[in-house]
Amino acid sequence: MHRIEQTQYGYKLVFEGFLQKQDLSTLLDDMKQTIRSRGRKFPVLLDMRHSRAFPADAQEIFKEAIRFFKQVGMERNAVVLNSAIATLQARRLGKETGIDATSRYIDASTEQEWEKVALAWLERAVDPDVH
């Protein structure tokens, strides 16, 4: 399951469960209908705390979704995870799509104030890897 929310700062995507290729295809379609260029850059919060790593065939669609976000103006993003495997996969996908410099990965299992940390990065560019 997934959810896309427009927020004051940009967009929030929430993933839950084990997402298959079809789930991500639906997500991509939803993104293309929901997310529009705002005429300026915007940040994205990706909440994957209740999700698991993507199967290989779904990863290509996820990369396409990342490229779409870049195309319509994504500036920074924060990815919140609970799984070491999902974190490794997210970092790899970030590198493969060229967003690794503007992505921050937050481990919600060790960071109780994960949302506060994520929003500090998204709204004010306070780097959680430095502070």
Explain the meaning of each model-derived region.
Residues M1-H131:
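Amphipathic, Lys/Arg-enriched alpha-helical "gate/interface" segment within cytosolic domains
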